[in-house]
Amino acid sequence: MKITVRLLCLRLLLAVCNVSGADDVNKPANTTILMVDDHHILYRSGTVRKLKPLKRFSDKPVIAADKLWETTVAYCSVYKNPESGKYQLWYQAWPGRSGCYMCYAESDDGINWIKPELGLLTFNGSSKNNILFKNGYGASVIFDKNDPDPDKRYKSAFWEQDLIKGLKYPGMSIAYSPDGIHWEKHPKNPLIKGSYGDYIQPPLANDLKQQGAQGKPVSVSDVIDLIWDQNRQVYAVYAKTWLDGPKGDMHWKRAVVRTESKNFIDWTKPRLIIWPDEFDSINDLAETDRTAGGGGSDGVQLHSGPAFYYNDLYFSMLQVMDSGGTGNMPIELALSRDGYSWKR
């Protein structure tokens, strides 16, 4: 009788698992199951999920804007080179109105950084600087161990709008490097036209000559995060985009799109994946006064969504921009099982 009852209970448990769509609860013994959401959990009554906030290392930045070409610094990528043991870091430096630069630093411990004098580019008559190339706005870098071409071991995706080189449209561009220092840009850049059609960033809503190109279709904009998606076996970019408002207001809200590529050259149409919702003051009126040098509207927006894949889950450190409130950009955790459908 006891055996019969046990078999009945086992069959009922298997039936519940199948009905709930939780077949993947049965993972191999050597697989780590993450409990950051309820995907693998059938029942958890009486439990509380607590996420431990990240702790900032110190009050001082580890990469300070302390060079002549560094009025501000932003948008970095980090990689630990297994051969040298050094951390490599690529970041954007903004000297002012003369455009931006992609710069390089390295470290033995990830805390104390050196900006080597590379001698690759001249700034104010001197090549004693750590500048890699010009106009790599929002550049993101990955190390690609699978590419058979050693000259393309490092890959970068970035926003470029170089009038000097005669680019017709700003947009997402790419570059290759054998060592992370010496870079070659793709001759057909930009590979994806940006989400607005001219070099003004962004144009005013009353600029009639621009209205045909605003966010239609949704495309990439000037914040780009590149990853190798090991789950889907593709290169993927999570980028900022601009959404038009419900009343036709241009550049109403910032949101996040994803595009991917098998060969790093041919990219899919950017797809909108994360956008402001009813909890983000989405009904705020558009702000068209951009005299301060930046675009956007009041209220909460999603400035960018850098992501990575770990075990069977995508994580995004979503940058939430509150331009009309505190002016801060807090980080929110977002989760996805496929890289496209996200929960915040």
Each model region followed by its residue ranges:
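Sec/Tat signal peptide C-region and signal peptidase I cleavage site
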Residues: 18-21
